[in-house]
């Protein structure tokens, strides 16, 4: 059993297990029980993590580059709400490949709230609308993650839990200041 959610983590664990088996063949003393315990207790805050904001359920993921966005989009396929409109709250640093990330994440019915990464230069909604004219109508802007969440709550919390992603700094900030609570 693996303590980390998601197919990518299962693939990573398989690679780690193969490396551990190879190490054991070189006379390293690593028991099967130690390997099982290590995998079961693995925990990565901010990676496909269920959280709560004012009692409302949401998911956070630190996906901050195109390969991570591809994996997050792939992971979405296994969610019960996979075919439902997804609300994204995305904060992406200015030096990152935000248009490529949004092309991976957004489906036609989705909406993305673009928020700044606290304390960092970030992509804004106007830049992304220029870079992605076909998705421009799907992009909204908020000053903070909290403001975007307030808007969602005022409109009626979405059926599919919103996903906060795009920056490990944002996730760290939200966890550190207590905006989000772990489930």
Regions found by a protein language model. Name each.
Residues 1-111:
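Nucleotide phosphate-binding/pyrophosphate-handling subdomain across enzymes
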Residues 23-24, 76, 80, 132, ...:
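Active-site catalytic pocket residues across diverse enzymes, especially alpha/beta-hydrolases
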Residues 57-60, 99-161:
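C-terminal helical cap/extension that packs against the catalytic core
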Residues 84, 144-147, 179:
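Residue-identity detector for threonine
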Residues 167:
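Active-site-proximal loop/hinge segments that shape catalytic or ion-binding/gating pockets
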Residues 170-172:
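Short, active-site-adjacent cap segments at secondary-structure transitions
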């Amino acid at each position: 059993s693996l303590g980390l959610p998601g197919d990518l983590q299962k693939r990573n664990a398989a690679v780690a297990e193969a490396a551990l088996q190879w190490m054991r063949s070189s006379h390293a003393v690593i028991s099967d029980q130690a390997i099982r315990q290590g995998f079961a207790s693995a925990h990565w805050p901010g990676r496909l993590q269920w959280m709560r904001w004012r009692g409302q359920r949401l998911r956070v993921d630190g996906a901050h580059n195109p390969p991570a966005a591809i994996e997050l989009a792939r992971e979405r396929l296994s969610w019960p709400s996979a075919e439902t409109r997804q609300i994204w709250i995305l904060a992406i640093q200015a030096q990152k490949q935000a248009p490529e990330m949004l092309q991976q994440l957004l489906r036609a019915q989705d909406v993305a709230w673009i928020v700044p990464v606290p304390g960092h230069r970030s992509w804004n909604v106007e830049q992304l609308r220029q870079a992605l004219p076909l998705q421009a109508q799907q992009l909204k802007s908020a000053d903070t993650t909290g403001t975007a969440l307030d808007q969602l709550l005022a409109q009626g919390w979405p059926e599919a839990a919103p996903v906060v992603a795009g920056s490990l700094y944002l996730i760290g900030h939200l966890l550190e200041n207590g905006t989000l609570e772990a489930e």
